[in-house]
């Protein structure tokens, strides 16, 4: 005669616990798989929102997907040549490519002003079209190390390749109230109208204590956050240097954003 299952025994309790754990793990795994498309869609919308924001095209009533499709053209640039990559996939991500040795380069220590060690060979850029369909701004991704985190942002510049229209940081883990103020629109506003380069084409934008007195190129560092501010300076120094966007910006100046 088969022994009756005793759920109150040690073995019975163990079986019940294992069964419940298995069922719960299946439910959780299913939820993760089911929610992933929703999470990816939200992530894309958030990114598009930041791009529209730095372009000055975002308010509380903005239809993000519609406005992005109408006003933003995403292109992929070969950073070594400054040329557009004609056959780049629509879903290309420099952030993902940067983790693939075949799609990225190691940065020499002496050149690594942003402290990022490596970067993708290609990157996305975003051309902002005006009401007349002409390119009025170019939005360039930028990232670099701060005190505690890698700081990811966008810089909007005019077609002259020199004048800043805006910046935003959309992902960072700096100290709240100190370095975290890189996400404060009031501080970001200080970059608007600044020139990246001097008359000889050398990077002149600088972020530091008292730098705001230089009305053309300077931005005051964040109070109490000298290392984060130094990280912002390093990010600009790398990405707007010869190993970053200079080849692309030179193409813009000679041939136009189109």
UniProtKB/Swiss-Prot annotation:
Q: How does it sit in the membrane?
A: Single-pass membrane protein
Task: Give GO terms for biological process.
Answer: sodium ion transport
Q: Which reaction does it catalyse?
A: a ubiquinone + n Na(+)(in) + NADH + H(+) = a ubiquinol + n Na(+)(out) + NAD(+)
Kindly list the cofactors needed. Answer: FMN
Please name the GO terms that the record assigns under molecular function: FMN binding; oxidoreductase activity, acting on NAD(P)H, quinone or similar compound as acceptor
One family from Pfam that matches here is FMN_bind
Q: Does the keyword Amino-acid biosynthesis apply?
A: no
Q: Where the protein is mainly located, per its record?
A: membrane
Q: What is this protein called?
A: Na(+)-translocating NADH-quinone reductase subunit C
Organism for this UniProt entry: Neisseria meningitidis serogroup B (strain ATCC BAA-335 / MC58)
Taxonomy of origin reads:
Bacteria, Pseudomonadati, Pseudomonadota, Betaproteobacteria, Neisseriales
């Amino acid at each position: 005669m088969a022994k009756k299952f005793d759920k109150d025994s040690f073995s019975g309790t163990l079986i019940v616990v294992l069964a419940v754990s298995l069922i719960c793990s299946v439910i959780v795994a299913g939820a993760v798989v089911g929610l992933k498309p929703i999470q990816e869609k939200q992530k894309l919308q958030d990114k598009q929102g930041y791009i529209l924001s730095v372009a000055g095209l975002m308010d509380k009533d903005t239809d993000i997907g519609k406005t992005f499709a109408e006003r933003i053209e995403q292109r992929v640039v070969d950073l070594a040549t400054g040329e557009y990559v004609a056959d780049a996939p629509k879903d290309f991500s420099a952030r993902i490519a940067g983790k693939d040795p075949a799609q990225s380069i190691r940065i020499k220590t002496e050149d690594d002003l942003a402290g990022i060690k490596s970067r993708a060979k290609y990157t996305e850029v975003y051309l902002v079209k005006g009401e007349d369909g002409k390119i009025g701004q170019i939005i360039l991704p930028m990232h670099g190390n701060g005190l505690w985190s890698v700081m990811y942002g966008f810089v909007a510049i005019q077609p002259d390749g020199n004048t800043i229209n805006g910046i935003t940081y959309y992902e960072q883990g700096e100290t709240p109230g100190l370095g975290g103020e890189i996400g404060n629109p009031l501080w970001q506003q200080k970059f608007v109208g600044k020139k990246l380069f001097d008359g000889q084409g050398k990077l002149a934008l600088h972020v530091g204590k008292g730098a705001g007195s230089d009305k053309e190129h300077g931005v005051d560092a964040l109070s109490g956050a000298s290392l984060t501010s130094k990280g912002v300076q390093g990010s600009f120094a790398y990405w707007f240097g010869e190993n970053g966007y200079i080849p692309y910006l030179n193409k813009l100046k000679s041939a136009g954003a189109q």
